[in-house]
Swiss-Prot record:
Keyword annotations: Carotenoid biosynthesis, FAD, Flavoprotein, NAD, Oxidoreductase
Needed cofactors: NAD(+); NADP(+); FAD
Free-text function comment from the UniProt entry: Catalyzes the conversion of zeta-carotene to lycopene via the intermediary of neurosporene.
Similarity comment text for this entry: Belongs to the zeta carotene desaturase family.
InterPro entries documented for this protein: Amino_oxidase (IPR002937), FAD/NAD-bd_sf (IPR036188), Zeta_caro_desat (IPR014103), Zeta_carotene_desat/Oxidored (IPR050464)
BP GO annotations: carotenoid biosynthetic process
Presence of keyword Oxidoreductase: yes
EC number: 1.3.5.6
Pfam families: Amino_oxidase
MF (Gene Ontology): 9,9'-di-cis-zeta-carotene desaturase activity; oxidoreductase activity
Pathway per the UniProt entry: Carotenoid biosynthesis; lycopene biosynthesis
Protein's name according to its UniProt entry: Zeta-carotene desaturase
Superkingdom to which the source organism belongs: Bacteria
Amino acid sequence: MRVAIVGAGLAGMATAVELVDAGHEVELYEARSFIGGKVGSWVDGDGNHIEMGLHVFFGCYYNLFNLMEKVGAKQNLRLKEHTHTFVNQGGRIGELDFRFLTGAPFNGLKAFFTTSQLDTKDKIANSIALATSPIVRGLVDFDGAMKTIRDLDRISFAEWFLSKGGNEGSLKKMWDPIAYALGFIDTENISARCMLTIFQLFAARTEASVLRMLEGSPQEYLHKPIQEYLEQRGTKFYTRHKVKEIKTKVTDGETRVTGLIINDGVETKTVTADAYVAACDVPGIKNLLPENWRTQWDFFNKIYYLDTVPVATVQLRFDGWVTEMNDPAKRKQLEQAFGLDNLLYTSDAEFSCFADLALTSPADYYRPGEGSLLQLVLTPGDPFMKESNEAIAYRVLKQVKALFPSAADLNMTWYSVIKLAQSLYREAPGMDLFRPSQATPIANFFLAGSYTQQDYIDSMEGATLSGRQAAQAILANQARLQTAVLASQ
């Protein structure tokens, strides 16, 4: 069977791996000049690796880890200390420290009860809310708890948290930075389902809250091994190939896709296959679907109710080590990297999470004779979309120095700003109902992408899981697809 996949992000590539392993022929068509989708990265003219986000691998990314192991990329992950670190104004560090003698759920209870990010009043309120949450049920009935959590999609996390005895202090100091890091929106705007899904996994599984980051850039250490695995098995990648139109035919009342009209910048051609997968993000799928499908099928019309959130990713290079707060000599020398080697959160800046990539992912980001390369995610990104890159860089620099007063005498030597007006889908309350399944009303047309139905959030894991589910839907209908192709010949 021949399958054409539109989109070479993680969802598209995960779909391809499953299909190729089952013995099928796959081609991927990507409109951009690089693969990877929202996890994509590239090298600029000066040799700097540029990313569109800060990519952290939680221990509960089981599907992504399985994919990475299969293609030989799992060894490219660097394990971080089992603690979630918050940097507050003035350089005060707060932690959710999951390191403990025993595993889940006790390490999680210890982390939240002893966190230095919250004062005593906030910790008590936080404990009350968590103690009355579905997370407790999940310790003995994981599937039942997950069903309860799915039903909480109708309300925001803040609404749920406050109704259970939580307080505003906990939301502001701890939960908002985490929500921004996960979904690019705060706890008043993110679904309770989204947040509680993550923390259900954290509570039930010791490894779920462990953090890892890539050895270097996503292109070199994640996408390249997947691409090589697929190409070694006959898969073809076509970048700069934009789908202009989906061709269809109605036979005996059934609509089927008969081809894709694709432009490569030089010529337009028609690609045919037995099955077609649209592995797009939300704006991509809205642009791809034929307009008449909206009126003909409510399944497709629901997709247009999904919205996205803007985000800006900023990289700042320094002439010293910004997160080394204790030793001035180490901070200013450039012979060795020093500082906080982990994902960092903050509630005191316009960026919710950040990391020094020269420490966390040194293969492509550490440069001899240079210092920190901070990568920071500005959320919500709305205020920055019309601002100049230079203004954004210096605005962020000022906030970095407020978090790290010890770095006041360090200089920014280079910056990059990447804006995405439409990034993750907005996981607002009530939106789960509009997420489509991977199988569609059109028998030979399938969807993949982290916005589609899958039991996780919009993330690298969600994208990978959606791709696996799309492939499973195709394989489950293989006989029907091949019969239809023979009948049309």
